[in-house]
């Protein structure tokens, strides 16, 4: 997967198109990511120790990784991600600017 937890991304498709956020979780087996503040859904929560009242809560649901694009830190614009091998390590590179991505 070309994105990691902590990356800043922009949603490029779907109901939240244009929103930006940070990736909080990745689901590698299903190629999905959870982006902070994006794809908020209502969940009916049973009473538990964490939620003694229960009720309806808002949570962030995962979206497919193809619907997000990484933001280039130098230009703050969406970019595709390339990979290079330097000193025997695989690193991520911005396709637009050529800069190394964290």
From Swiss-Prot:
This protein's GO CC annotations: ribonucleoprotein complex; ribosome
UniProt entry keywords in alphabetical sequence: Ribonucleoprotein, Ribosomal protein, RNA-binding, rRNA-binding
Classification via SUPFAM superfamilies: Translation proteins SH3-like domain (SSF50104)
Record InterPro entries: KOW, Rib_uL2_dom2, Ribosomal_uL24, Ribosomal_uL24_CS, Ribosomal_uL24_KOW, Translation_prot_SH3-like_sf
One GO term (biological process): translation
UniProt superkingdom: Bacteria
Family (UniProt): Belongs to the universal ribosomal protein uL24 family.
Subunit structure: Part of the 50S ribosomal subunit.
Name of protein: Large ribosomal subunit protein uL24
Species whose genome carries this gene: Leuconostoc mesenteroides subsp. mesenteroides (strain ATCC 8293 / DSM 20343 / BCRC 11652 / CCM 1803 / JCM 6124 / NCDO 523 / NBRC 100496 / NCIMB 8023 / NCTC 12954 / NRRL B-1118 / 37Y)
């Amino acid at each position: 997967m070309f994105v990691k937890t902590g990356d800043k991304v922009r949603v490029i498709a779907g109901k939240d198109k244009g929103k930006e956020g940070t990736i909080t979780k990745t689901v590698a087996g299903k190629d999905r990511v959870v982006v902070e503040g994006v794809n908020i859904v209502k969940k009916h929560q049973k009473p538990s120790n964490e939620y003694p009242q229960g009720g309806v809560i808002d949570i962030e649901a995962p979206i497919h990784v193809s619907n997000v694009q990484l933001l280039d830190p130098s230009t703050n614009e969406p970019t595709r991600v390339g990979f290079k091998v330097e000193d025997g390590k695989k690193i991520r590179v911005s396709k637009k600017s050529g800069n190394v991505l964290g």
